[in-house]
């Protein structure tokens, strides 16, 4: 059961983590948040390698649209808040997409200071390609391999990992971690005692 006041406070609190040390407007494009009780189904059209467009059904935990609409599964919002050290948080993920969209397109490059674009592009491209390769090899990594889908998902998954598993991300992808520290203007390692988090399986990174 969704309790409206508690639910909106929880979502707002987690979404505002991404803005803590920034002087930005508070999600200027955000227009609405739709909450479903649990994971929901959507129809998506995908272009196949042979040029044929195929429609398929997907179960999703959340969505973020460039027009400012965010959709969330309440079950997964609660799960993310219950364990803030597992690297999975649908609120952080979808609101990272909202930040990304502020540049005019959702492509893994949110609005940045002019002198940081070159470094951001280099580090994110290298780490994205590395995650794609590890995903193809079915290797366990500190980041969820859903981030290998495209650059936009890479940024959203990197944001989840940055806030929830900062020590692990720093140990295995230090340059990526530093870029996220500069972007978000904070260091979540100060919030998490090292060794308190856990990782599923043995990481190959």
Where are these regions (language model features)?
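Metalloprotease/metallohydrolase-associated module, dominated by Zn2+-dependent proteases
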Residues: 12-21, 25, 40-85, 102-205
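Short, basic and Ser/Thr-rich N-terminal targeting/leader segments
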Residues: 9, 27-29
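A general secondary-structure junction signal
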Residues: 35-39
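Intrinsic-disorder/low-complexity, polar/charged segments
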Residues: 1-4, 149-150
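Extended, charge-biased low-complexity segments
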Residues: 31-33
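Short, structured protein-protein interaction patches enriched in aromatics and acidic/basic residues
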Residues: 3-14
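Catalytic glutamate of the conserved HExxH
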Residues: 87-90, 94-103
